[in-house]
Design a protein with these regions (language model features):
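Bacterial Sec-dependent N-terminal signal peptides
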Residues: 1-44, 96-118, 360-363
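Proline-enriched interdomain boundary motifs that mark the N-terminal boundary
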Residues: 26-36, 128, 220-226
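Beta-strand-rich structural segments
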Residues: 44-57
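Solvent-exposed segments in extracellular or luminal domains encompassing
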Residues: 77-86
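Append "Rare intracellular matches occur via the same short Y/T/C beta-strand/loop motifs
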Residues: 85-95
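Local sequence-structure signature of Cys/Sec-based thiol-disulfide redox active-site neighborhoods
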Residues: 119-156, 160
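Short, conserved sequence motifs used for protein processing/export or organelle targeting and
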Residues: 160-363
Length: 363
């Protein structure tokens, strides 16, 4: 059975807004529920455990947890499943309740463990920046931005500093179209949800600016490392991502699933696009990172230096809609954000294959 990627973190509030880094509006609530996992095996034994807090006080014992669709109470604070599907759980404590449920996905295969850590005591990680390109096949000025990116990436050292994701959210007729996140204007580029660039007429100058910005972002030590372990069955991809902290902090985790070799005729007002511009790489097919009003990732909570936290993500691979001929054209970017003022910025990212584990990348 196939599933949509509907894996929301604790007390998620879905708001009609398409920011990436966003701000912290709507993220805090007096009564909140959380879970120790978001994906379980549908064997009737694997269980997810829920907890509840009111203004920071543990009220789990006094909270009743329900399946939202049927308002059936759970047996205590645990949920098991003997059928494949997505289960939505809410909590009620006195007059307090959670408006948005926690989604738990039950799958008919074993949930993958985290990738093996080759150096458990090491916290010195390779640092890469997350470069998000907002373009579309119907955007006539977008080849200028793509040209700047290509020029910047001609330098192998610069290319290795970044993980690139192409967000085709401009026009619905785009074969790689995704409805969100969106940009305020197109073309647009963002690095780590912190530094942004809009269109100008000088791709070579823009390439120089991009190279400088990427170098500055990765010049500081990485606050976290990221590993991933994917498995797949019947076009359902399940990925467990683990985060290890190099610095104490509260972190969020997201995964954007990407596809290469997507063909789409590119509009070009600049007269610079040859046939290669009709083949699009790193196209975002699913941005599983929405929390509150942003796409800054699902909260992992506080992680102390040397400790880890994890989350599992599920993707329904739609070969027909995506015109996907080769599964090797799929990969994913796993990224971590941390709060910076009212915004959330990416503090590290890795590009992962769907066919093998990605261990922590140490310096």
């Amino acid at each position: 059975m196939k599933f949509a990627s509907l894996l929301l973190a604790s007390a998620v509030m879905l708001i009609s807004c398409d920011k990436t880094g966003g701000d912290d509006t709507g993220l805090d609530a007096g009564f909140q529920i959380s879970s120790n996992k978001n994906v379980i095996q549908s064997n009737g034994a694997d269980a997810v455990t829920f907890t509840a807090e009111l203004d920071g006080k543990d009220v789990t014992a006094e909270t009743t947890f329900y399946l939202k669709d049927s308002m059936t109470p759970l047996d205590g604070n645990k949920l098991t499943a003997d059928k494949v599907g997505v289960y939505h759980v809410i909590g009620m404590y006195g007059t307090f309740y959670t408006e948005e449920p926690i989604a738990v996905t039950a799958i008919d295969m074993e949930v993958p463990a985290p990738a093996e850590d080759p150096a458990a005591s090491n916290t010195s990680f390779v640092h890469r920046a997350f470069l998000n390109q907002y373009t579309g096949t119907g955007c006539g000025y977008c080849p200028g931005m793509v040209s700047a990116l290509r020029a910047a990436f001609e330098d192998e050292e610069t290319k290795n500093m970044a993980v690139h994701a192409a967000v085709h959210s401009y026009n619905a007729g785009d074969p790689a179209y995704i409805g969100a996140p969106k940009a305020s204007g197109y073309p647009y580029m963002e690095i780590d949800m912190a530094v942004s660039f809009s269109y100008d007429l000088d791709p070579d100058a823009k390439a120089g600016v991009l190279k400088k910005a990427l170098s500055e972002r990765v010049s500081v030590p990485a606050k976290v490392g990221i590993s991933a372990n994917p498995i797949s069955k019947d076009d359902v991809l399940v990925v467990t991502v683990e985060v290890k902290a190099a610095e104490d902090g509260e972190y969020n985790l997201g995964v954007w699933f990407l596809q290469d070799n997507v063909y789409g005729q590119q509009t070009d007002y600049l007269g610079i696009a040859d046939n290669s511009y009709n083949y699009h790489e790193n196209c975002v097919r699913s941005a599983d990172s929405r929390f509150g009003s942003s796409f800054a990732g699902h909260p992992l909570g506080q992680i102390k230096k040397g400790e880890t936290a994890q989350r599992t993500f599920v993707l329904n691979i739609d070969r027909e809609a995506w015109k996907l001929k080769d599964l090797n054209d799929l990969h994913f970017a796993a990224f971590v954000t941390a709060k910076n003022g009212r915004n959330y910025n990416v503090v590290n990212v890795v590009d992962c294959k769907i066919s093998e584990p990605t261990p922590y990348q140490y310096k």
